[in-house]
């Protein structure tokens, strides 16, 4: 293999730049040229492709976002549109592609693989919802961003004796809510994977109040429903002074944590190794702190699951 491409797609996550850097430097170490594809699959279709050198990825390992930019490209689901992308890859002499992103990005890589072009997926999403890996690039940074925000909100909640409902990202996966809620001692954690009884939530809050608790924190993943509606329901049912905070896109930004930088470096380099070995159609991950790779089609057939033991622990500790 003489030449590979790399792109980032979908929602950005801290550590994507570290992964790009690892792909470029690992490939050049093996005398392979690397071409960056800008704006994800949209840039692939339009031919926004440029050669990357060692200097192209200097001074980016500590930066959030993605040097290659990113975009969503729903039209890439069309086989004819994908053929245009493959034509662009062949036009530039690119023989393999590293795709850094989440579920939608993996779907694109899977489709390219099925159409005969070798791709390797690298899990880059703050949601931590990609099958075949314990952690995704960006999750740890986003988690620490959320924890820092909740710590600050708890200070004001304590001062004003208020109940706070805090909405975090996670449309289909509750990992951010669960990990942050457990780390911050939230009184209640609501996630899409687990049904909840609003009457039980209110009863828990009232029990806390009866034993002298002056404030409470409820962490809600966005996929559960409107945090504003949940906050109104709580205030009406308890008469507690209740506020709602939606953390939003602040969770995606910021300098990546050491863990995300190292994870991204390991996974990006491993993706290049797989392409060199002629193993396209794979996705890389980390399980039990060991690098692994899976068939991307088989991986996407699996479903991300929440850590049931951790969820149960959060309930037991929030009595």
From Swiss-Prot:
Listed cofactors: Mg(2+)
UniProt catalytic activity: beta-D-fructose 6-phosphate + ATP = beta-D-fructose 1,6-bisphosphate + ADP + H(+)
Record's keyword terms, sorted: Allosteric enzyme, ATP-binding, Cytoplasm, Glycolysis, Kinase, Magnesium, Metal-binding, Nucleotide-binding, Transferase
Activity-regulation annotation: Allosterically activated by ADP and other diphosphonucleosides, and allosterically inhibited by phosphoenolpyruvate.
EC number annotated for this UniProt entry: 2.7.1.11
Entry GO terms, CC: 6-phosphofructokinase complex
Active site positions: 127 (proton acceptor)
Residues annotated as binding ATP: 11, 72-73, 102-105
Biological processes annotated in GO: canonical glycolysis; fructose 1,6-bisphosphate metabolic process; fructose 6-phosphate metabolic process
Location of this chain's protein in the cell: Cytoplasm
Segments forming a coiled coil: none
Pathway annotation: Carbohydrate degradation; glycolysis; D-glyceraldehyde 3-phosphate and glycerone phosphate from D-glucose: step 3/4
Amino-acid positions noted as binding ADP in the UniProt annotation, renumbered to this chain: 21-25, 154, 185-187, 211, 213-215
GO MF term set: 6-phosphofructokinase activity; AMP binding; ATP binding; fructose-6-phosphate binding; identical protein binding; metal ion binding; monosaccharide binding
Domain of life: Bacteria
Positions contributing to substrate binding: 125-127, 162, 169-171, 222, 243, 249-252
Binding annotation for Mg(2+): 103
PROSITE patterns: PHOSPHOFRUCTOKINASE (PS00433)
Function: Catalyzes the phosphorylation of D-fructose 6-phosphate to fructose 1,6-bisphosphate by ATP, the first committing step of glycolysis.
Family listed: Belongs to the phosphofructokinase type A (PFKA) family. ATP-dependent PFK group I subfamily. Prokaryotic clade 'B1' sub-subfamily.
Self-association state and partner proteins as the record states: Homotetramer.
Identification of the protein by name: ATP-dependent 6-phosphofructokinase
Gene from which this protein is expressed: pfkA
């Amino acid at each position: 293999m003489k030449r590979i491409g790399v792109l980032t797609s979908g929602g950005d996550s801290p550590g994507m730049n570290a992964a790009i850097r690892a792909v470029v430097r690992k490939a050049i170490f093996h005398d392979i040229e690397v071409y960056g594809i800008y704006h994800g699959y949209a840039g692939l279709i339009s031919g926004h492709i440029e050669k990357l050198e060692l200097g192209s990825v200097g001074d980016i390992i500590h930066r959030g976002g993605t040097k290659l930019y990113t975009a969503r490209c729903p039209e890439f689901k069309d086989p004819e549109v994908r053929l245009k992308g493959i034509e662009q890859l062949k036009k530039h002499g690119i023989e393999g592609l590293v795709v850094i992103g989440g579920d939608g990005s993996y779907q694109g890589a899977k489709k390219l693989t099925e159409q005969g072009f070798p791709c390797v997926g690298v899990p880059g999403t703050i949601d931590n919802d990609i099958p075949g890996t314990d952690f995704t690039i960006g999750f740890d940074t986003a988690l620490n961003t959320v924890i820092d925000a909740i710590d600050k909100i708890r200070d004001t909640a304590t001062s004003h004796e208020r109940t706070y409902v805090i909405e975090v990202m996670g449309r289909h996966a509750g990992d951010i809510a669960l990990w942050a809620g457990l780390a911050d001692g939230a009184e209640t954690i609501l996630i899409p994977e687990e049904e909840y009884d609003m009457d039980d939530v209110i009863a828990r809050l009232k029990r806390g109040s009866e034993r002298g608790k002056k404030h409470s924190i409820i962490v809600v993943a966005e996929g559960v429903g409107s945090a504003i509606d949940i906050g109104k329901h709580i205030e009406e049912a308890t008469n507690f002074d209740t506020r709602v905070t939606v953390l939003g896109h602040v969770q995606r930004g910021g300098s990546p944590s050491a863990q995300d930088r190292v994870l991204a470096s390991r996974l990006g380099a491993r993706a290049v190794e797989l392409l060199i070995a002629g193993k396209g159609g794979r996705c890389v991950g980390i399980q039990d702190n060991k690098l692994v790779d899976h068939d991307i089609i088989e991986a996407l057939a699996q479903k991300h699951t929440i850590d049931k033991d951790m969820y149960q622990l959060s309930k037991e500790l929030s009595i």
